[in-house]
Amino acid sequence: MTIGRTLRAGVLALQGDVREHLAALEACGAEAVPIRRASELADLDGLVLPGGESTAIDRLIRAFELSEPLKAFIASGKPVYGSCSGMILLADRIADPALDRDGAPQRTLGGLDVTVRRNAFGRQRDSFETELKFDSLSDSERPVHAVFIRAPWIEQAGSEVEVLAVVRIEGIDRAVAVRSGNLLATSFHPEVLVQESETSELRVHELLVSMMASRLSQDANQAESRK
């Protein structure tokens, strides 16, 4: 069944790489919109949780009363992609959560059966770029040019989580891209390269848009079968 309309993707727009993700999604043919209110989630086919500062985004999510609506969106099965701090927000567990002034650990939205470590590759000065083999992308034989900025890695993943890319650190393969059902997460920032012609990387966002199209088609087929 054909979709018959433009896919609508939201980018949580409280802090972080919002404009870059909007541009990447538009370049993939989706209608991309910033999301700041719970009511704006209703008409989305998919959602991006952008890179930024995970503790700041956690505080803003609570301040804007978005925690429960976002958890409900994730639980709905619609595709969600988290990059860098977005991966932290999707994780069920944080190995080293930041603490607020009262000693309470930062919270996540959850949904992805992984344990992440914040700033695992180091601080801002330790940011780096590398070429990654990334399964499940179009032209998967061509490596992804990945930008890591104060990035997390995944220390443990559940049995239903598929590891799509790893970085080898001190002899250990660290998972930096995973998928579980319609949840997708990367430690790195593909969105920052969208405007750079020599290294432009849209394939991660193309994967998200493909997931959105598949979900919408499944919903349409189920609705048709109930008639």
UniProtKB/Swiss-Prot annotation:
| UniProt-annotated catalytic positions | 84 (nucleophile), 189 (charge relay system), 191 (charge relay system)
Any one Pfam family match given in the protein's UniProt record, by short name: SNO
- Which one of the record's GO molecular function terms can you name? glutaminase activity
Cite the EC number.
4.3.3.6, 3.5.1.2
Q: Which residues form the signal peptide?
A: none
Catalytic activity, as annotated: aldehydo-D-ribose 5-phosphate + D-glyceraldehyde 3-phosphate + L-glutamine = pyridoxal 5'-phosphate + L-glutamate + phosphate + 3 H2O + H(+); L-glutamine + H2O = L-glutamate + NH4(+)
Summarizing the function annotation, the protein's role is: Catalyzes the hydrolysis of glutamine to glutamate and ammonia as part of the biosynthesis of pyridoxal 5'-phosphate. The resulting ammonia molecule is channeled to the active site of PdxS.
Record family assignment:
Belongs to the glutaminase PdxT/SNO family.
Please state what the protein is called.
Pyridoxal 5'-phosphate synthase subunit PdxT
Organism equals Renibacterium salmoninarum (strain ATCC 33209 / DSM 20767 / JCM 11484 / NBRC 15589 / NCIMB 2235)
Gene behind this protein = pdxT
